[in-house]
Regions:
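Catalytic or ion-translocation cores adjacent to nucleophile or general acid/base/metal-coordination motifs
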Residues: 3-57, 90-133, 169-178
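Polyanion-binding loop/helix "lid" in catalytic or ligand-binding cores
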Residues: 64-66, 127-130, 137
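Flexible loop/turn segments at secondary-structure boundaries
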Residues: 3-8, 27-31, 70-74, 93-97, ...
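Short coil/turn connectors at secondary-structure junctions
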Residues: 15-18, 58-61, 82-84, 140-143, ...
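Active-site/ligand-binding-proximal alpha/beta "capping" segment
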Residues: 63-91, 98
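Generic beta-strand/beta-sheet core signal
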Residues: 22-23, 67, 89-90, 146-148, ...
Length: 296
């Protein structure tokens, strides 16, 4: 439940689901509860699983964080033959020193990372291999399983010989590339005034421009109600080619006419139609077989 994974509980509850997330560092769970991205915390895996099952049975929207290593949660789900509808992972698997090996508390991991980083790396890679195998087993049992861009599969295959690690797809070929194919990508803006009202003013302009897009309308209305700003107030949404230009010109007009209190900074995201050549993420499984090409 770090910088990226921390968004997932709220994403799931915004779509009226039940989220069960493992996080080894308890303070991260507390932070997500404080910022309203997460609903409940458990320290016991079975209690967390039972709470998630109860919520699903009663069609109650709920997000749960359990203080444990991800592999321990996955193993317990398998032991109890509980198959999640959807399964993914956002641990820091791209960096062996940020990933937390099994059988260590967060505090023990911090000490080992400082005193013996090479042993730490090897333990991390061992756990990554176990992690991928558990995900593959849950996929085999029916869970819709995908990689969320942290290179967990690549680490398990390249450094621990898990040859079938890529049997579950990355999220880009599985879900995002159809959006890329029509030029749709993330469009984000931040209010330098620090006043949330400036973002709400921009939101309204986007609603006026793109009221015919039900997904965008739903997102903007829900985001205002449920997203807690961190740092400068900001918003992100997905717009298609040409729409981003319309939105930017409309926001520029708000600045020019003084309808917002200060400048609005507009940015893009590395996850985009013409972004990076990353064979295990943005350019995975390119149709022409050339996953080293950044755009097509």
């Amino acid at each position: 439940l770090g910088g990226m994974g921390g968004a997932q509980p709220l994403a799931i509850t915004m779509n009226e689901g039940v989220c069960l997330a493992a996080e080894i560092e308890e303070w991260r769970i507390d932070k997500r509860i404080e910022t309203r991205y997460l609903d409940q915390k458990f320290n016991d895996i079975d209690q967390a699983i039972d709470a998630a099952l109860d919520a699903a049975q009663h069609k109650k929207v709920l997000s749960i964080g359990v203080v444990c290593n991800a592999v321990d949660l996955l193993q317990r789900l398998i032991d109890r033959n509980i198959i999640p509808h959807t399964l993914t992972d956002q641990t820091s698997a791209h960096d062996e020193l940020s990933y937390v090996p099994a059988n260590l508390t967060a505090q023990q991991a911090n000490v080992l990372r400082q005193t013996d980083p090479e042993t730490y790396r090897q333990l991390s890679l061992d756990t990554m291999a176990q992690h991928v195998k558990l995900m593959l087993e849950l996929q085999k049992r029916g869970a819709i399983t995908f990689d969320y861009g942290n290179n967990l599969r690549g680490q398990a295959k390249d450094k621990r010989g898990v040859q079938n690690a890529f049997d579950f797809p990355g999220f880009v070929p599985a879900y995002i590339r159809p959006l890329f194919c029509k030029g749709s990508g993330p469009f984000r803006f931040a209010a330098l005034s620090g006043d949330p009202q400036d973002i709400y003013t921009c939101d309204q302009v986007l609603l006026d421009l793109f009221g015919h897009k039900p997904g965008l309308v739903r997102w903007l209305k829900m985001a205002r109600e449920r997203i807690a700003f961190q740092g400068l107030p900001a918003r992100i949404c997905w717009l298609e080619m040409g729409e981003r230009q319309q939105a930017a010109l409309a926001i520029n007009e708000l600045v020019r006419t003084g309808k917002v209190k200060a400048l609005i900074v507009i940015g893009r995201d590395h996850l985009d139609t013409g972004s990076v050549a990353s064979p295990n993420r943005e350019t995975e499984a390119m149709l022409d077989g050339s996953d080293a090409v950044a755009d097509w």
